[in-house]
Amino acid sequence: YQKQLDDIPQARIIVVSKQDMRLRVYDFKGTKLMDYGIACGRNMGQKHKIGDLKTPEGMFFVQTIEDASDRTHDFGDGRGEIQGAYGPYFIRLDTPGSKGIGIHGTHDPLSIGTRATEGCIRLNNNDLAELVSIVKPGMMVLVTPSFQDYEQEQRYIGNRRDSVTNQ
């Protein structure tokens, strides 16, 4: 019976808290199976457009689990392409309105616990390897905001409302 549940992506859920800077995995009974520190988007608030450096909030699903060991990334800091920027894996999420958002490893373990990414959810590489062992396409990922994200979103909505009424 447990083996059958292990094969169902919906039998587990990943919950990412931008408030606690934690990624937790729960089973269908609500038992916490894993708990890791993360880094998330540099900017506060809900993701509204590509390049805003925000981690999207809401319910998403794992699309693919990809080998990222040979991938590089240019962080725009003058150092050029960084080998291993994504760690060993990239767990691609289905995030409508955004592309390239996922859960991945890091070349910079000291960034965990900070707002350091361009929107992705970053883990230590050992934690990511453990997480990948149970992740399956179709698995649900819930990303929840921090209080600061919520306040930033309220300002964003207020500014948009004001700009529409002042036209």
Residue ranges and their predicted role:
Residues 1-101, 149-151, 157-162:
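Gly/Pro-biased beta-strand-loop elements
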Residues 29-34, 109-110, 138:
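Short, surface-exposed beta-strand-loop junctions and turns on beta-sheet-rich folds
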Residues 89-94, 100-134, 140-142:
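Active-site scaffold segments
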